[in-house]
Amino acid sequence: MRKIKVVFVEYQLVCGGAEQALFDLIRLLDKERFEASVFVQTPDGPWEAKFMDAGIPVIHDYDCRKPTFNPVRKLGNFVKKCTVAQAHRREGRGLLEICLPEQPDIVVSYNAWMEREIAFVRGAKCVKYIHGDPGTNPVYRKEATQEQDVLRRYDRIVCVSRAAWNAFRELSGLTQQTELHYNPLNSDNVRSLSGQPVALPDDLPLICAVGRLAEEKGFERLLVIHRHLLDQGIRHRLVIVGDGPDRDFLPRLANALDIQDSVTFTGYQANPYPYMKRSKFLVNSSFTEGLPVIAMEALCLGIPVVSTVPSVGEAFGEEDCGLITDNSVTALEEGIRKMLTDDTFYAKLKAGAENRSVFFDGKRMVKEIEDMFESLMKTT
C-alpha cells in the first residue's frame, strides 16, 4: 500500500506548544500509512535538531544558499535561488514545488505566520490549522475576518479547541470544511519522562508554569501574584520552565519584587515533565491561547491546572480537575490562593485530575487526524 505523503509547513521550529504538538503528531502517525516531513520557512529554529534527531525530515529552501566550489552545483544553486526568490515575491506561490523532493499528497499549513500561497501545491490537498482563539487573539481574528478568499481554498480547516472552532466559524462564516480536532498527546512518553530526577526544593508547596517566555504568556503577572501571596503569608515556591524573548526581563523583575529566592527559572528544558510532576499544580497565565498542550500534559500526569484560558476547561471533560478563572490578575490570584489554602478543594481537584489522566491516549487522539487525511485522499 502506497503511503500518504504529508508535508507540514511551519514558519520556524521554535520551543513552543504548537511545535511540541506537531512533534507528537508526526511521531504518533502510523508509519505504515503515512510519510510525514516538515518544511520550514525560516531556518535554524532551536527545535530543528529535535525533529531531525527523531528521524523527521526537515526541509527548507536554504540549501541552495550554501557556498560550494563545484561549478555545476554553483550554477544550479544560482538558478534555484532565483526561482525561490521569485516564489517569495508571489507570497510563497510555487515555493514547495521548487523545494520538495517529491510531490506531496497533503500539505498542512501549520502556522499563522506563513506566506499566503505557500501551502497550495498543484495536485495536493490543503489543510489549515488554527491554533489560537480568534475570539481573543487579534492575529487569528484578522485572519478569520479578512482572509476568507484564501481560507476558502483549503480542503479542511482544523481548530484545536472548541472555543477556537466556535469563534472561527462565527467570524469567518466558513462552516462546511472546518473541523475540531484536539492536538494528540504522546501520553506514554510524557508519563515515562516525568519520572526522571530533577533538583527542586521540597520544603514548600511548588507551583509550576511552563511555556515560552513572552508577553502573551502572562508570566509577568504571575510573578506579581507570587509576590502578593507571599505578602499575605501564603508560603510557596514558583518554578518557571521555558525560554523566550523575556528570558532577561523576567529574572530582573523577580529581583525587583524581591522574590528571587522563591522563584526558579530553569530555562529551556527538553523534558519539562519532572518539574510538573513534582508540583502541587500547574498555572497557565496566558492572556490568549487555543488549547495549551501543556495543560493536557499536566492532566495526563494527574496534576490539576489553574488557567485564565477558557478552552482549558475542554480538557477537563466531566471531571473537576482544575480551575478556570477570569482573565485578570485579581481572579488568577484568587484561584491560586484557593488552591494553596483550601485543602479540601485541592484534594477534590487532584483526585479529578488523576481520574482524567486516562483520557489522554495518544493513539486514540491521532486516529481522528489519520481518518481526516485518508478521507481527503478519497475526495476528488
Task: Give the location of each predicted region.
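Acidic anion/phosphate-binding donor-loop and adjacent secondary structure
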Residues: 138-139, 166-170, 179-204, 274
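A short, active-site helix/loop in glycosyltransferases that binds the activated sugar's phosphate group
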Residues: 116-118, 154-178, 185
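A conserved mid-protein helix/loop that constitutes part of the nucleotide-sugar donor-binding site
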Residues: 16-24, 205, 209-228, 245-252
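Short His-centered aromatic/hydrophobic patch
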Residues: 91, 108-114, 130
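Conserved acidic donor-binding segment of nucleotide-sugar-dependent glycosyltransferases
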Residues: 318-330, 338-343
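Nucleotide-activated donor-binding/catalytic signature segment of Leloir-type glycosyltransferases, i.e.
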Residues: 251-267
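Short hydrophobic beta-strand element within catalytic cores of glycosyltransferases
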Residues: 304-307
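Aromatic "clamp/platform" in nucleotide-sugar-dependent glycosyltransferases that forms part
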Residues: 268, 287
